[in-house]
A protein has these predicted regions:
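The feature captures the conserved acid-bearing segment of alpha/beta-hydrolase catalytic domains
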Residues: 166-256
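C-terminal accessory extensions appended to soluble enzyme cores
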Residues: 215-314
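Basic, amphipathic N-terminal segments that precede the first structured/catalytic domain
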Residues: 20-44, 98-99, 138, 147, ...
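Short, surface-exposed "cap/lid" segments of acyl-processing enzymes
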Residues: 32-37, 44-99
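Alpha/beta-hydrolase fold nucleophile elbow
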Residues: 140-152, 175
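Alpha/beta-hydrolase active-site loop
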Residues: 87, 106-140
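Bacterial Sec-dependent N-terminal signal peptides
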Residues: 1-21
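Short glycine-enriched nucleophile-adjacent loop
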Residues: 155-166
């Protein structure tokens, strides 16, 4: 029933496609479950003959899809429009991957919080995987892979997906936590381990800053064990029992990579007790979450550096 409904919605959105791609906006939205907004950013030159990457991006708490996409700022604009720029970063990624279709599916809900949405949906363990599978099924391509990505509370969507599958399917090739793995605990580790060891091309990357010392108005932002710094290190500790890692340091980052770069962790130092939550996305974070460990890793951009996509912001 759900798949039938989603197909009806899809064809109502893309029903004009047969009349010519030149007349089709590459971004379209529709709603599911009554409280979920789906926005598909599909390249205008989409070809079913190209390998297709479908990147699900679960929105951070408190942000709309439009704010997450970003825009060129004008006087009076809300500051949220200038902190992620996923749309411009998507354009950059497409320039680096011209032989592939790179599709982004933004996932927003009425509560602007995936943890809150899951509380309202006790059957989320079934609903989230079904949502992902059904949306991926809408895109016709000879070869499709799924990336799961999210910032802040968006990580809760990813964990909801993981909780709902017995094992991570081989169609999922990349999981990225952009300062968003607050919900990690040891119960998820066996699924990560089996997926990384058994699925060819599986890649995991995690971004976090030392939020355990961050202050806002003189008060801690998170508890000592409640933030991504602690949760990311916990995941790393579990992985180190089964995978070997190298460690490197820069002026502001501690980086761990597995031997084949299949797994990567980026830890942002915090020497002034500041808040560096959104900067990890803004400073080429989405780009790096997609390209790190590939042949395009750090080509024409650097993570946590000047916006490589600045001229693509509209």
């Amino acid at each position: 029933m759900f798949q039938r409904l989603i197909l009806i919605l899809f064809f109502s959105v893309y029903g004009l496609m047969a009349k010519g791609q030149q007349n089709i906006n590459s971004i379209d939205s529709f709603r599911l479950y009554g409280d979920v907004k789906i926005t598909i950013d599909k390249p205008v030159n989409f070809s079913p003959n190209k390998k297709t990457i479908i990147s699900f991006f679960a929105l951070p708490n408190g942000n709309s899809t439009e704010q997450t996409m970003g825009k060129k700022m004008q006087t009076g604009d809300d500051w949220h429009f200038d902190i992620q720029h996923i749309r411009a970063q998507t354009k950059f990624i497409r320039q680096q991957l011209p032989k592939k279709n790179f599709v982004v599916i933004y996932l927003e809900n009425n509560y602007k919080s995936w943890p809150a949405w899951k509380q309202k949906h006790p059957d989320f363990k079934n609903e989230i995987p079904h949502l992902v599978d059904s949306l991926a099924g809408l895109l016709e391509a000879k070869q499709k892979v799924i990336y799961l990505n999210g910032h802040s509370g968006g990580g809760s969507f990813i964990f909801g997906y993981l909780a709902g599958v017995e094992q991570i399917p081989s169609s999922v090739k990349r999981i990225s936590f952009l300062d968003s793995d607050y919900g990690y605990d040891s119960s998820y580790y066996p699924k990560f381990k089996n997926w990384l060891q058994q699925v060819k091309g599986a890649a995991l990357n995690v971004f976090a800053y030392n939020d355990s010392v961050a202050l806002y108005n003189g008060k801690p932002v998170v508890s000592a064990r409640g933030g991504t710094w602690y949760r990311s290190h916990l995941l790393l500790q579990h992985l180190q029992k089964d995978f070997s890692f190298s460690k490197t340091n820069t002026d502001s980052l501690i980086i761990y990579k597995s031997g084949n770069s299949q797994i990567q962790f980026y830890f942002k130092l915090n020497l002034n007790q500041g808040i560096y939550h959104t900067q990890q996305v803004e400073l080429n974070g989405f780009i790096h979450s997609v390209l790190c460990g590939t042949k395009k890793d750090s080509k024409k951009y650097s993570y946590y550096s000047t916006r490589a996509y600045a001229d693509l912001i509209k």
